[in-house]
Amino acid sequence: MTEIAGKLFTWINTRLPIVNTFERHLSKHPVPSKVNFWYLFGALAAVTLIIQIVTGIWLIMPYSNTEEQAFSSIEYIMRDVDYGWMIRYMHTTGASLFFAVVYLHMFRGLLYGSYQKPKELVWIFGCTIYLAMMAEGFLGYVLPYGQMSYWGAQVIISLFGAIPYIGESLELWVRGDYYISGITVSRFFALHVVALPLVLIALVFLHLVALHEVGAGNPEGVDIEEHLDEDGVPLDSVPFFPYKVLNALVAIGVFMTVFSIIMFFFPEGGGYFIEMANFQEANPLVTPDHIAPVWYYAPFYTMLRAIPDPLGGLIVMAAAVAIFFIVPWLDRSKVASIRYKGIFSKIAITMFGVSFLTLGYLGTVGVTEVRKTMSVICTIIYFAYFLLMPIYTKYETTKEVPERL
């Protein structure tokens, strides 16, 4: 029996390079021997993506993508489908934690220069993944057809109307009707469960292929490829499997514990994961007292509200996301890691982080004059971090980077 299995494996391996692929990307793929916890969020993002895909498949089975039955089918899932409540809460909790770990993953990239040469494509693919996530999250947000889903979608889609000349036609084309209706739900459903997941999977594949081609970074910003042994393997590296895989499994265990606690005991997340208004069916005749996006869109929604002109707000909001794509060419520093950059880089990234968190908070609360002023200030700080980067990274005094880890 063992001999037959061995021959079968050999037959398959000569036609499908299983061993070579495993060795190249796992058992013999060199990764830096010294990294910190910031480098675990990529693995956690992959775990949450898998959770979203699996739970999403189960949710679409009993879900009905019609205006009349969308909300009631969610209630049916929650009340009558075996473990339907758990699958739904896994999906909603997973959505929020997916964005949380991706935000931390992106922040790590800014901290340690994970966009510098030759990692530009790795960064660009990552930013495109984030853009696809935003679209995927918005489309899924509309599907429960609750009050906040309806009015939130109404506000966001109406932004297209601010574009000169083509705005009204584009708004109608996106919505598919003159108001949020079953047509909108149906087309958003198709995009959410088929089109964008395929795009996400393809982008993640390209992101990983590009990463494995140029090699992973490290907190020191040291290029481990500069010091090789007689076999051409970096001296300051270990095989990805089993060392980093086992390390990631510990982090995944802790993450899933936190995930489970939230899912079972705080599934609504205090109204941040699932808004209380979304437990009511959409009513086009009744506007909620306060229309706010899900927390992971809140910083950009705050920027939108900070600009009085609708078109100006739309441009600022779009630019806030798009500017990440050009970071590799904005940073003129000779060192990658924040550990060895100058004081201006450290102050700038601290102010950027504080402004982003403040914008996130302001996007979840009502508008007052003080909050509007804070929104404008934080928006300016947000963009200043990027736009002034070519100046402060070029002229600041940096520390000497060690030759090896």
Language model: regions and residue ranges:
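Membrane-embedded and interfacial regions of multi-pass energy-transducing membrane proteins
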Residues: 2-97, 101-405
